[in-house]
Amino acid sequence: MTPTELAKSRLETTYNRFAPFMQCIALYVIVFVLSALGFILSATEKKAWGEALRRSASWVLYATLIVHTGALLVRMSLMDRPFVFVTNLYSSAVFIGWGCVILGMVLERIFPLGVGNAVAGILGMATTIVAHNLTTDDTLEMMEAVLDTNFWLATHVTTVTLGYTATFVAGFLSAVYVLLLCATVVKDGFTDPKPPSLGGLLSFGAAAGGVVGIPMVLLWFFCTAAAAKFEWVHSSIPMVVLVVTGGAAAFYAGGLLFLKAGDVAVDADGKPLATGQLPAAAKPLAGMALDADKVKVFGQMIYGVLCFATLLSFVGTVLGGIWADQSWGRFWGWDPKENGAVLIVLWNALILHARWCGMVKTRGIAVLALFGNVICAWSWFGTNQLGIGLHAYGFDTRLADGCTNFWLSQLVIMGLGMIPAVYWASATRRRAAAAPVVLVPVALIEEALAPTPGPSVVKKKKRKK
């Protein structure tokens, strides 16, 4: 064995013992917890604590990114493939997570709200857990002959996976937006002086369930994925977490709905609340409610990320066609993987054109971007389960079940995002929408009835101007 081979063997042994991506999972959990707590405290009166936690999450995220980047570089060195990060499904997961973290950090730098850190933590944790569930006996396995070309692996595959990255980031930003929208429904439901209608109660109940249900689903997903692979996580943990958190979420949401429907809310002294006053149970959500500034920021973030997703997906798909022409003698063959790639391009382009044409605004973009998660997951993993085509890697029950659960969760969040605006718009907008239509403005009537000023008065007004 040459000295170079010996050094590489020692490097691989150290890499396997340290398990850098396993360390990243714990660090991403810390980032997400700090970001979530910071965002919640920033929405209350403890803004200084919220800002401190947000900055702490950023520093932990920087450290985690260093570990994640170092692990990718070590893998590249061990495989002797310069500038090639993706060689199999496992490496695609860890690379997509790396891209999501960088994009989240950029968003946090531009919009220091804690949202970028939270999305980076969620996606970094999720992708590394997915990668761990995709591990085989050897994650540095040999490449298939048809894929053994560094140029196309460094261009087409990298660009396409970065398109996946941007699409997922836009989708998870949209999920956070829907979460805040649900908090807005709860807040405005209590501040609306009108008696609740049946539709209002249904929307209020769905929002109250969603504002606690979305975090619960994320927690259950991560616990299930961890229990499936990590020996130190007992198999009953996901069910225990689901029962405990689900019960707490149902109790909280049911309590809010009872207060809204029964009009029995009281203050700390036990006295009935005045009309439009928030009960104590709903105050934690009041600061999370959307306002004009938050809606504008989320619209800018989701739109900007979708632009990058469209560009990267389009360029990557075209490069894939050129590679297919060189390898298989045809540019396009309607292979399931190729269809999945073009679906991402078409869907992201559809969202952008809908916005440019004024057909949708921030909420519409968010709901459509959530379905982009469904399409992206289908292109990434779903097409591999069909067992046909040149990109199929065989059916995997874990991937099939995981994709199905993920798709259902995105459809539920989309449903919450489509709560009618009349139930979550601000009180001012509700009053404006309910105001009677006046064909002749009052100002014109007053102007017509007012006495006509004389010439001298008109001249004086002109001189003042």
Q: Where do the language-model regions lie?
A:
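Short secondary-structure subsegments characteristic of cysteine-rich extracellular domains
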Residues: P196-S203, G454-S456
